[in-house]
Amino acid sequence: MDFRRQTLVSNGGSSQPQPSVPSSAIKKASRLGPARQSLAPSQIQSRTSILGVSNSQENASHGMMGSRKSTVPGKMGDRDQLMSASRGDGGIYGRTPQMNRGIPGSVRRSSVFTSNSQGRTSMAPGVYSTAYKDPRPLRDKVFQSNCMRNVNEYLISVRYPLPLTAKTLTSPTAKEFQSIFKFLVNDLVDPGAAWGKKFEDDTLSILKDLKYPGMDSVSKTALTAPGAPQSWPNMLAMLNWLVDLCKALDNWDDPEIISDPLMVPATELPLDYPNLDDRLLWDFAAKTYSQWFDGEAEEFDEAEQELEHAYDRMASATVAECEKLEREIQKRNVEIQQLHVQEPPLKKLEDEYVQLMSDKNKFISFLDQQGQKIEKIRLRISKVKEAVISQEAELEARQSELAHIEQAVAAQNLSPDEVQRMNHERDSLTRSLEDLRNKISEASQFAYDQEMVVTKSMDRFEGLLTDYNSLAHQIGLLDSSLDVPSLAANVNYNLDVDLGAEELEEVKAVGVRMRSTIWQALQTCRETFRQEALGLGNGTIALEDEFDKLGQSVERQKEEVGNLEVRLKIVHNQAEDAQSQIASENSDTNKIITQLETEVTNMLAASQQGVLSTQSQLESTRIAFKELRHKTALFQDSVVAEVGEHIDAIIKAKEHTANSLKSIRALAETQ
């Protein structure tokens, strides 16, 4: 099974082949390969901390079991879960236009696309200075028709509330365009997004956040009059891009389209999947812990049965492998018996050795004879050389005689035609020589320019390599003294590239290692840190929620105390007024005043008692919270210990199996 993520958009949206995801999500090809990849720590990864084992286990289990929900209108619970930080992009699609527009560094996509060719990549100047050009044929009628069909079908499928007319997607008004754009953005980013007074500013900000590749073609003028002939093709392409994003978001969790191994149950993974045992244990622990935490059950028969079935499948595969090895052992035993029955191969080799030694002696004698023949041939060659020298002397004499004759011929008069022909040939040869000199000069200049380009590229690569080493030291990739448990143990993150090497295969090997090993390890490390940070964030949110509840309770108690104090003041005022009015009245009135003062005293005592009881309740709640947190930590430690015991038992079982196989292999070798 291919566990690479497949396309997220169905093919039924447009008749013309379009990218399954927006072009902004496609990683642009790097001219220098993986060396141009941004390795700077992101805003989340830079805050490195030592996390507890229990938290990391819980985060890993939730990371594997959590799913990304669809965003079809009417399912707000699924949309809220999709907008959470459980997604790989950190929930950037859930930000409203009034929130921070900056996408975190962990989401920015670096250029890691390598060239299709395996040879040396081109280092011609001007590659990085060219602006991005939209490859889509925006003015093509067929492309526009496909875009309109795609947008119209999607709006109908998601029940767009406003009516769609024939002119809605050909020359819409500003109000219609704004309505469609807001509907798509609310469906993609945030259903409760608040819009400002200026639609154009919000639109540009949202498109920048979504990394729309054709930002150069979107302006405030075009957004003000989207139905204009010069503006509508760009606006239509932008709406089609948003529709593709919405489709990708709807199909984010469709098992028929994607095949993410983290979203596939561990029981359905192939037996050769790496770390299948760990994955089974993580899924089992996550499932049972969530059930236990919710108080649904104390025994997990269904989960244990699934785990038993998975281990039975693994055991059956191991038994089949053992049977295969046993058949191989029997086959080898039969071969050994056949070798014992046949003639010993050593005797055959000895006879062959005697024959070879005899051939060797004959060959040596043959070489001696050939040496004698060589000496005779050398004598003959020396005699021939002497004859050649004499012939050369005679040839020189003949040549001097020929030169004397040519001088005599030159002294004679030549015709004008012959002179003109000779001059013409000399001029043509001179021009040819000058052209050759110019070509040589141009070739030398071109070679010098290419050498300067290569030198600059090498200097730039050295700078990038220095930055990589510095950042790697900061996050502990190259410092062995730092204990970073999330790093792969068998991955060497050190890059030692000799650009001056004569063999290009060495440089290519380093590049292949960077793409296949280091990049994958860095991606795994980033995902681990992201899961850990997500777990800490969820825990912090829960604690803050509990703290807010306690604060609200305290505020309510304070309000009650304030009301009692107001009532007390009112009663005091009434008592003072009564004293001024009935100062001259009889003793019965004094008794009434005394009774009122007694009631006021009782109310004051009751209010003070209420304050004291509220404070004691707050202190008891804090103590209970601390005890609950302590119990939670103890339970997490016990869960970690139990998981460790299970892992130790599995490791021992593996070691026992390996030792058994070794004993069988040793027995086979002895036989």
UniProtKB/Swiss-Prot annotation:
<dbReference type="GO" id="GO:0051301">
    <property type="term" value="P:cell division"/>
</dbReference>
<comment type="subunit">
    <text>Component of the NDC80 complex, which consists of at least NDC80, NUF2 and SPC25.</text>
</comment>
<keyword id="KW-0175">Coiled coil</keyword>
<keyword id="KW-0132">Cell division</keyword>
<dbReference type="GO" id="GO:1990758">
    <property type="term" value="P:mitotic sister chromatid biorientation"/>
</dbReference>
<keyword id="KW-0498">Mitosis</keyword>
<keyword id="KW-0137">Centromere</keyword>
<feature type="compositionally biased region" description="Polar residues">
    <location>
        <begin position="108"/>
        <end position="121"/>
    </location>
</feature>
<feature type="coiled-coil region">
    <location>
        <begin position="375"/>
        <end position="447"/>
    </location>
</feature>
<comment type="function">
    <text>Acts as a component of the essential kinetochore-associated NDC80 complex, which is required for chromosome segregation and spindle checkpoint activity.</text>
</comment>
<dbReference type="GO" id="GO:0008017">
    <property type="term" value="F:microtubule binding"/>
</dbReference>
<dbReference type="GO" id="GO:0051315">
    <property type="term" value="P:attachment of mitotic spindle microtubules to kinetochore"/>
</dbReference>
<feature type="region of interest" description="Disordered">
    <location>
        <begin position="1"/>
        <end position="132"/>
    </location>
</feature>
<feature type="compositionally biased region" description="Low complexity">
    <location>
        <begin position="9"/>
        <end position="24"/>
    </location>
</feature>
<dbReference type="InterPro" id="IPR055260">
    <property type="entry name" value="Ndc80_CH"/>
</dbReference>
<dbReference type="Pfam" id="PF03801">
    <property type="entry name" value="Ndc80_HEC"/>
</dbReference>
<dbReference type="InterPro" id="IPR038273">
    <property type="entry name" value="Ndc80_sf"/>
</dbReference>
<dbReference type="GO" id="GO:0005634">
    <property type="term" value="C:nucleus"/>
</dbReference>
<dbReference type="GO" id="GO:0031262">
    <property type="term" value="C:Ndc80 complex"/>
</dbReference>
<protein>
    <recommendedName>
        <fullName>Probable kinetochore protein NDC80</fullName>
    </recommendedName>
</protein>
<keyword id="KW-0131">Cell cycle</keyword>
<feature type="compositionally biased region" description="Polar residues">
    <location>
        <begin position="39"/>
        <end position="60"/>
    </location>
</feature>
<keyword id="KW-0539">Nucleus</keyword>
<comment type="similarity">
    <text>Belongs to the NDC80/HEC1 family.</text>
</comment>
<dbReference type="InterPro" id="IPR005550">
    <property type="entry name" value="Kinetochore_Ndc80"/>
</dbReference>
<feature type="coiled-coil region">
    <location>
        <begin position="541"/>
        <end position="584"/>
    </location>
</feature>
<keyword id="KW-0158">Chromosome</keyword>
<feature type="coiled-coil region">
    <location>
        <begin position="293"/>
        <end position="343"/>
    </location>
</feature>
<keyword id="KW-0995">Kinetochore</keyword>
